[in-house]
């Protein structure tokens, strides 16, 4: 299979796994290894980032009406220093707060992500561990969370 066809397959893998409770990044590392593809570009962090940028573009486009509501609401809350008013102000800031842990981990673990976390064996083990954690959370966790139940500490968690 040529590199272009492999890239198409990788794009499909990214599209299918991004919205499931599995690691799309992990699958982007596992699939070439299982398929025996050794193209350095397809196995690169740069290619993985490009696929994720494509996913981001698709999300921004699909949810554009929500973003057009939430961004001005979040900015208005910042300007007025108040979450009072419509629920969009609060939701915009809950989303912003929920991104903080990922941002911090990304900054702190950048070097590891670029090197060690791209090793196939480690990725396979972490996918199994992540699956076990999701299974336990599904078995023991609450099944229902309404928007009114969301708090800033829960957004951070």
Q: How should these model regions be labeled?
A:
Residues 1-157:
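Multi-pass membrane proteins that catalyze or facilitate reactions on polyprenyl-/lipid-phosphate substrates
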